[in-house]
Amino acid sequence: AGTLTLLMAELLAGLVISQTIKRGAQILLGMLPVYFDMRTMLNFYDPQSILISVACSEMMKHYAIPHCATSGSGTGWGMDLIAADTYWMNTLALLLSSGHLAPFIGDSLGSKSISPTTFVHCHEIIDQALRLHNGFQLDDANSAVDEIFKVGPGKSFLNQPSTLKNYKTGYYVSGVYPRYSMEKWMDAGQPPARQVLRQKTQNLMASALAPEEYDEFIAKGEEFIRQRFHDIL
């Protein structure tokens, strides 16, 4: 609670300073939900730090101030088991709060590294977490009480209107990880999930179209690297 109190004081002070400099300036207030370990000199995500971020989001909602936080940032060594649990915890907590903008997706190793596979896996997490966040409608139109009464016990709902309408979207289908039975997984060569993710990521990168300003953007980046690091390119 003390950390949250100090955080609110810092954020609101920043708001006052920004409006003093330029009245009406647009601003987002928020935090990176991390602790800093003085022994290792590293920051890291933690359930408590993410909880403080959620509380910060609720306070920004109370003040009617736009909020930003992270969703899918992790402390793993790339896209690994360490990162996966943090991505889920970070994303779901933000969606269950009053979170707004969520930059900083897919970083690892103290935000010094980004692996393309992290973006693809985070997309999976965000897609599923949004379904939890959106919930479902519990009303007469969606509860299908009339159909249940009409069909009666011991019969099939396969040809009922609600089934025909929703059977393609009634449950989540991953765009990355197939639902293998043990037999099909063995027939596929027993691939590790990380290998499947890597292949999907490579396919996406190979099929992605470069933006119109790609050549100009890359040229500027290479020129900056040459000036800073001389003959590295």
Residue ranges and their predicted role:
Residues 12, 67-72, 88, 93, ...:
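Long, contiguous hydrophobic alpha-helical segments, chiefly transmembrane helices and signal peptides
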Residues 31-38, 70-79, 108-113, 144-153, ...:
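A glycine-rich phosphate-binding loop feature that marks nucleotide/adenosyl-phosphate handling sites
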Residues 33-36, 67-71, 102-112, 175-182, ...:
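Short acidic (Asp/Glu) and glycine-rich catalytic loops that position anionic groups and cofactors
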